[in-house]
Each structure stands twice: as C-alpha cells, then as structure tokens.
C-alpha cells in the first residue's frame, strides 16, 4: 500500500499542516509521500488534458474545489496504474492511531479512516475518548447529508451517501476505476462528494485512525483552501 498526502506547494498553510501530518505518521512507522496538489487556477488545462467535465457548475471563484478534485483524480489514476491500494490524505489529515493490522482484508472498496463528523461541535471530545483497543469496521453513514438528497431521498449528486471530508481514506484500484468510469459518463463533483456509496462500497474504522488536523477544529470554513480563494 502507498501513502500519499496532497500538499499545495509554496502555500504556507498547506505545507505546514502536511509536514505535521507526515511527521506524525512516522511516529507510527508510516512513510507518507507528498503529492504536489493541482492549483485550481490551472483547472481548465487539466480538464482539457483529461477530457472530463464537471457534472454541474461550481460556485463562483471556487477554484480550490477544482484543484482539490483534480489532485484526488490524478491519485485515483495512479492507484489504478500501480494496481495497489492507496491511502490518500489531504494536508488537513492527521494520524492519531497506527494503521490496523490486516486493514486491507476488512473492506471492499473504500475505507474512511474517521467515523466521526469533523463539523460536529463534539468532534474533539469524541476523538479524545477513542481507543484502538478494539478495531471495528462498519458501513459508512454520512452524519449530516445536508441538502444532498431530495424529498424522496434521491441523491442530488447521483453519488449517493458521500464522504464528509476526504482528508483520510484508503481506496483499492478497482474502486478507483469505478469512480473514474462514473466520471467519464456523468461528469465530476467535488472530491469528497465524488466518493459516494452509489458508486463504491464505503466502510469506516471505529475508532478513528486519521482525524481532521486539530488546527481546523471549529475553523474548517475559515482555513479551507477550497472555500477561500484568497488563501491560495
């Protein structure tokens, strides 16, 4: 298995937190390789190169959303080409537990490494009480699929119940190909919304292995590079 962290080079926020994640991973014997993120300002060139289109128009000036998606997309392609599972981290991911033994035997397609809602006011308390004395794997249930389903319960994005944050997950090659093939037909949506259970099976670990970086707690919207073009 390969470990990759998406880092926006020459961006102080991204580099600082990515470096902290890599250093923390080493304390658990995990070597994480950097992946230089695609800058959102270059998204048109990459869409032309990849021959893919968005499923719908993204919010104005949200170039960070394009850059984030493209970074994940290129890693999905690498995962397929290498034909080995990838652990994909964003710069705001942070290891708090070692990778469980035989982890690859315990999920089918995608494993989210945090079963908690990073937007919850109780996130830190729930994380602090976690223990790796016993590891469980359960089907993923988006804790707050706000505005993602219509009144009949149909996914507006077409991807189903998707990840609430893509800061730490493992994906197997056949699952990455499922996502790539879906995009070729339907177009793409933001990276975390792209990984949905209408496309791939999703399990989560209990307790958490990779959490949202502590610096982001309560400040996700303020520090997010996807939501704040001025930070890019």
Residue ranges and their predicted role:
Residues 1-89, 93-232:
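An acidic/histidine-cluster motif and surrounding catalytic segment
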């Amino acid at each position: 298995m390969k470990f990759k962290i998406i880092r926006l080079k020459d961006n102080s926020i991204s580099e600082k937190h990515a470096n902290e994640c890599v250093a923390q991973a080493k304390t658990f014997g995990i070597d994480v390789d950097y992946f230089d993120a695609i800058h959102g300002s270059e998204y048109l060139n990459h869409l032309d190169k990849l021959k893919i289109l968005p499923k719908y128009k993204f919010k104005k000036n949200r170039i960070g959303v394009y850059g984030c998606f493209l970074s994940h997309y290129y890693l999905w392609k690498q995962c397929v080409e290498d034909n080995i599972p990838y652990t994909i981290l964003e710069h705001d991911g942070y290891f708090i537990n070692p990778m469980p033994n035989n982890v690859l035997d315990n999920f089918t397609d995608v494993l989210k490494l945090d079963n908690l809602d990073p937007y919850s006011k109780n996130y830190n308390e729930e994380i602090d009480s976690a223990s790796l004395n016993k590891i469980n794997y359960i089907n993923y249930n988006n804790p707050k699929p706000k505005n993602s389903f219509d009144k009949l319960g149909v996914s507006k994005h077409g991807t189903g119940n998707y990840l609430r944050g893509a800061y730490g997950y493992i994906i197997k090659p056949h699952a990455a190909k499922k996502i790539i093939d879906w995009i070729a037909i339907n177009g793409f949506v933001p990276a975390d919304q792209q990984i949905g259970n209408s496309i791939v099976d999703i399990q989560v670990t209990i307790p958490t292995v990779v959490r949202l970086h502590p610096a982001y707690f309560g400040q996700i919207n303020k520090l997010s590079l996807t939501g704040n073009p001025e930070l890019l």
